Amino acid sequence: MEKLTMLVLVAAVLLSAQVMVQGDGDQPADRDAVPRDDNPGGTIGKFMYILHGCPFQPWCG
């Protein structure tokens, strides 16, 4: 019984290691995708957004 428990534990560790090595299965299309522009206004647009919005969210009424 003890050998069976040890065998199951070793198998679980090996399967876990295999999943970590394989990663999350990124497809080539995902890796080569063009990053989305979160700031289409450039630096000026980002600065104006900060001035317009409230930088301290919990304290804004």
Swiss-Prot record:
Residues 24-52 form a propeptide. Keywords: Amidation, D-amino acid, Disulfide bond, Hydroxylation, Ion channel impairing toxin, Neurotoxin, Secreted, Signal, Toxin. GO terms for cellular component: extracellular region. The keyword Signal applies. The modification Cysteine amide is found at C60. The cysteine framework is C-C. Its target is unknown, but this toxin may modulate voltage-activated calcium channels (Cav) or calcium-dependent potassium channels (KCa). This is Contryphan-Li2. It comes from Conus lividus.
